[in-house]
From Swiss-Prot:
The keyword Isomerase applies. Belongs to the alanine racemase family. Pathway: Amino-acid biosynthesis; D-alanine biosynthesis; D-alanine from L-alanine: step 1/1. The gene is alr. It catalyses: L-alanine = D-alanine. This is Alanine racemase.
Amino acid sequence: MADKFYRPTYLKVDLEAILKNYQVLGKLQPNKTVMPVIKANAYGMGSVNVGHYLKKHGAEFFAVATLDEAIELRMHGIDTKILILGVVMPKDINKAIQHRVALTVPSYAWLNEAIKYLDEDLEKDLWLHVKIDTGMGRLGVKSAEDYQKTVALIQSHEHLIFEGVFTHFAQADEDSPHTKEQYEIFENWVDTIPHPSYVHAQNSAGTILFDAPICNMVRTGISLYGYYPSEYVEEQTNAELYPSAEWITEIVDIKYLNIGDTVSYGSTYTAEKSEKIAILPVGYADGFPRMMQGTNVEVNGQQCTIIGRVCMDQMMIALPENEDINVGDKVTLLNREHSGPQSLLSHAKQQQTINYEVLCRIGRRVPRIYEPEKVFDIVNELQK
């Protein structure tokens, strides 16, 4: 891991806040295992550092999306249980066994094909979680009969372990009857045969708002990092979450515009008066998109507007008159508030998307600085 970076743009990640959220979510669903979802580089926070910190504080089972993500965790010393939520190609099943990870069974056909690739001299077990499609329209078996047939095939093989069964809610973050309907289907099908070790259905929204008595594990993603899955969820709960990310940059240059001067590509901004502007070393290649033109960043407590188009690596802001703002002053792009102009919610609205996507867009060339001080670390992906 690198201990330096050479551009003053970075994402501060508060691991203690993530731990608090892990504990809050666990208290909402007592007697259930909390499975932290650390796919997509832990929603941009850094899966290795997040994984190690949560493991140190009791997490025993992580979820990722791909075999590559699971291998990354193993290569960095995370030896907990890991479930891959996405599809692993049948031909790669022995690689999954080698790294001791659990796989999702998306269909009977997948399982039947995967078995063909098992090494003949296999000595290690493979843990499997059967996915049931109760209304997401994505992965999963589509009937109780298919579920029973799939489990029977697993149990007919000496080294395949039926460890879990799960589904995924499509509208748990909305005021919709669909979640209850999905849960009832899931419960009915799961109850047709003896339960495996893990039964899980609740995502972040389901964990916060929905009781699922048949389940003994919850999968927490966005809320693990301190963000509500939707405004509806935030309105419906008293659970306090702690935002964990703060995106900071610095002013690298200041210049003065005359009346009529233009700024950035397309000359979309024209100075109507003499004004002072600052250049920031961050752009859409870092995950700060062009559509953020006209929104605000914070400098020394002042709201400053982004003028002209956001460039690949830089952007410009207008500075208020008579304010003592200089090269080297810190600029907040994203703060740890739940609302306000630099909140993740505000970013999502401005970008016409969801908070998940905003976090996942923050690029690999933005170093992550981990707090608190007792675990201080810097990860610069470009110097690994």
